[in-house]
Amino acid sequence: MSRAKVYGLLMALAVLFTAGLCACSAQPHAAAETAPQTIVVGIDVFDPYSYLDRDGQFAGIDVELATEAFSRLGYTPEFRMISWPDKNDLLSDGMIDCIWSCFSMNGRETKYQWAGPYMYSRQVVAVRAGSDIQSLSDLAGKRIGVQATTKAESLFLGEISSLLPEVKQVNSFETTEDMLAALRKGYVDAVAGHEALVARWTNQDESSYRVLDESPYSSELGVAFAKGTHADLAAQLTQTLEDMKQDGTI
């Protein structure tokens, strides 16, 4: 074999070897590009929507829906327990990417970048079993317990138009546990909140509490991003949630 042919063969082998190295080095990079992105989801203790189970793991309706929806979009949700009154500061400071915790869209349509609605919820009122309160009109002059910065608080403070009577006092609590404890101990005459939350609690002790038949308000639940951010993701998430309704996931 001539020297020229040997040289040509060596050059061809060198090109193939170099190409192989480039392909090998590119594979991890490609894998990294397709790896799920992490998105930080702020949630509150709001059983049965979001809470910590006995093993300290995040659980609940919203946790399951968020995990499935973001997975379909190529994201891995990182759930972060937050203080509900601090939610807006955490969102604007970038400590969380979104709020997904039985959050009502109604009356807040222009305050956030929304995805949804994905579910509907009624506000209800619960009282002690022996209470003389039988209807919403009987709440006149009574002491009401609500969780701070919730739709129920806005309703009873008169920030939202409703047929509720004027009450004696609105007591706002940081957590639902504190709110429910206040009713149990007689510090308030009634409490108000999302139907699923109140029903889950009263069903555990039906002999001690009951829920009024009338509902003061119905609302749409959505996922809130900071206003002016994540517009594309919010639109994609809205479509994904709609797909989940159609396929029976929701």
Describe the function of each predicted region.
Residues A19-A23:
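C-terminal motif of bacterial Sec signal peptides marking the signal peptidase cleavage site
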Residues I43-V45, Y120-V127, E195, A199, ...:
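Periplasmic-binding protein-like
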Residues D89, S101-K111, L155-G158, A182-S218:
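A ligand-binding cleft/hinge motif common to bilobed small-molecule-binding domains
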